[in-house]
């Protein structure tokens, strides 16, 4: 599918960000609340950095890891820089972040919805299948099938009174100009 991007101009990324990418409901409150309580957050995605960097910056993630689309002379090449961030790479990121923060992996909460998230979800102390495909959800002890991302706050023991409802960015990630 990435090969279909071959020769598309880079400005298409800004158009997609503006017209097609929306934040999941509750994302801003989730991140603002966790940051206000001293949590470290990382966005680890099988998507592309051209999108995740802007999303991570708008929400205040501490780290962002995703696949890098290769570009040349202002156009996409239809190729992805190696290594590909897939199932094993997500586990490695969890291990790396936990080690860097001197955490036991059992102190980590990971969230995902696809088969490439299962390794990470099983490795984390709290692995949450969020609106996941049935084949993924059935392999996880914690599942959120309804509700928004603030459900993750309740799982961590926050009360609604602890939520930060006035986060700095409760809108779409902004395209670069």
What label would you give each PLM region?
Residues 1-4:
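Helix-loop "lid/cap" segments that line or gate small-molecule binding pockets
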Residues 6-177:
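C-terminal cap/substrate-recognition subdomain and adjoining C-terminal extension
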